[in-house]
Amino acid sequence: ANAGGRALAIISPDSGDGKTYTATNLAVTLAQLGGRTLLVDADMRNPHVHEVFNLSNQTGLSGILSGRADKQVIQQVGAIPSLFVLPVGITPPNPQELVERPAFGLLMRELVSKFDHVVVDTPAAVHGADAAVIAAKCGAALVLARKNSSRSAALRELVASLAGAPVKMAGVVFNEF
């Protein structure tokens, strides 16, 4: 999740495809295998990562990007010493605008330099261009498709939205849960 200085964005067409489930499990596994691992909740439309780990969501990524917080808002997960989480914080009215700012790309580069692995949970592509913008600034993306749910046209559209971006496609996961 940090090959060549990249973070890995977990993306999918729709809500309920399993992005948060996949991102959290991947981050836990990477942390258990060794190396400092950061899980970033960049789903500023419907954040859930803080709930999975029972962490505070008072401040986080949205605060950093809007200049109201610093990186001290990254929280260590008690049960897994090498796992850290950057929650969303207050849900902003302008999530896509925040991730389009140069500050998001700069933050991702800084986080990749400080952690061995960086995994990023994203909003569903159906809600806007956030996921594609986030993936481009992460540098790598893993696409999720949900069995009997994801439409092939929506998957093609999502992959096509990344075509002009500097994104390494890590693959597609066919998910059933």
Across the structure, where does each feature detected by a protein language model lie?
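P-loop NTP-binding module
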Residues: 1-177
